[in-house]
Amino acid sequence: MTEFWDNEPSPLQTIDNPFLDKFGIRLFVKRDDLLHQEVSGNKWRKLKYNILGAKQNNFVSLLTFGGAYSNHIAATAAAGKLFNLQTIGIIRGDELTPYSNPTLKRATENGMKLIFVSRAEYEGKMELAQKYGQSSYVLPEGGTNLLAARGASEIMDEIVSQLGCYPNYVTVPVATGGTFAGLCTKSTLQTRVLGFTVIKNGEYLLPQINDTIATFGNPDETNYEIFWDFHCGGYAKTTPELLNFIDRFQTQTGIEIEPIYSGKMFYWLYELINRNGDYFEPNQTIVAIHTGGLQGKPKQSLVL
C-alpha cells in the first residue's frame, strides 16, 4: 500500500509571461494536480498519513464531512475504493442528492455512502460521527488535522529540493487551513507563505492554524500572511473578472484551473503582482501551489 504514496515529486513548472517579466517576478507552479487523477492536489497530501494510519490500525471504514463541491469528499471516496475502505460522507445540505453535481455523483460511483443533513445538524459533527460511524476512522471536514498538515509540509521539502533554495514566497488557497499550516511548519523567515481564503469570514481558522504550527515548528520563525477578503463573494461564488482571468490564464499557460480554489489564488496573486511593487519587490521568486480540484469542474454550476 505504501507504494501509492511514493510518487515522484510533482512537477515545478515555470510560467513565462511578459506580465511577470515587467515586474521582475519568477513564478513557478507546483503541479500537485498531477499527482493522481482522483486523489490529487492537496487531498493526496492530506490523506496520505491518515489512510496509512487507518490501515495500520485495522479500520475498515472512513467517515468524513463536506459540502456539495468538496474535493475532500471526492478524494476520500476515491482513496477508499483504492484501499478497500468503506467510506461515509456527511454532506451539508439536506436538499441535495447523490446526483446534484459531478462531485457528489463521482463520490457515489466510488462507493461512498452519502448522508445529507441540514445545515443546523451539520454543526453537530461529533454527534453525527457517533450516530453514523462509531467504528469508523473519522476525518474532519476538509481532511484537516495534524496528520494532514504533516503530509502537506512535504510540499515545502520538494520545492526546496527542486529549486535548490527557498523561494521568497509560497502561495496556496485556504479553505480549512490544513495545507497552509503544513507549509508554514516548514517555512523559514526567508520564505513568506501567503494564503488566499476561498470562504467568507474565515478568520475563525486562525487559532487552529497557529496551534498546528506550534505543534510542529517554531511559531517565532514562521513568516506568513493570510488574505481574508480575497474570496470573490464566498465559497463557490465567482465574478465575471475571475472567470475571464481563468480563461486567459489557461490559454497562456496550458494549465487548467478551477474557480473555487486555485483559480481564486492565481487571480489574486496576479492582482498583487500588478500593484506595481506595492506588495512584491522586483526579482522575487514565487511558487504557487496548484491544489487540484478539477474533478468537478466541467459541469459545476457556480454562483455569480
Locations of the language-model features?
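PLP-dependent amino-acid enzyme catalytic core
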Residues: 1-304
